Amino acid sequence: MTDFVRARSEEQKQARMAEIKAAADSLFNSVPYQEITLSTIAGKLSWTRANLYKYVTTKEEIYLEICSDKMHSYFDDLFAAFPEGKTWTPDEWAGRWADVLNDHRDYFRYSDILCTIIEVHVSACRLACFKKSYFTGKDAFVKLMADHFSLSDHDASEIFLAVLYHASGLCGSTHSNPVMKEALKIAGIPHKERDFRLSMY
């Protein structure tokens, strides 16, 4: 066990939280979510669980922070793909959006468990910060799309949500799941790998 020194300054706390998120993200990509605990996250950091409790109280608090980081990265790339002053046909828009979606599959894997798992195990205050950021990005992109194609805000919002939910569900279903593959084999059902970008386009 390495010596643990509690962070004091805000910069130190942010650096420590970055370590925690990196460890949790690594576990998310290597083991089933239900097997991840604060103890396994602490173990990957060579900390005790008590030390981890100085920063978070549930693993979902960590994963909400990770989801937030990945969401901001997604929105940054989404807006960069559609600079002001340029025009695209619906087909061109769909292709550029599909490229961004494909580059941010990790965000959609987290989104797949956001509402049903992550959000129910965090405080309202933490979730409020996340929701504020989400709606800021969503509303801005919806306006951009509505203005570009002369859509109502409602219709543009419905398109955004349909893409988000489809991407999240598709990422969850296309992610490698050994149990699912074994179940299909037992049931005699052929397993077909899906092309995520093509499915989103």
Name each model-derived stretch.
Residues 103-125, 178-183:
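Amphipathic alpha-helical segments used for helix-helix packing
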Residues 121-149:
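Amphipathic alpha-helical packing segments from all-alpha helical-bundle domains
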Residues 15, 19-26, 44, 61-81, ...:
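Alpha-helical structural segments
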Residues 147-201:
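Hydrophobic/aromatic-rich alpha-helical bundle segments in the mid-to-C-terminal region
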Residues 1-15:
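N-terminal intrinsically disordered/low-complexity leader segments
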Residues 94, 138-142, 201:
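An amphipathic alpha-helix signature
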Residues 19, 27, 33-61, 65:
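Helix-turn-helix
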Residues 65, 79-107, 159-163:
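Hydrophobic alpha-helical connector segments
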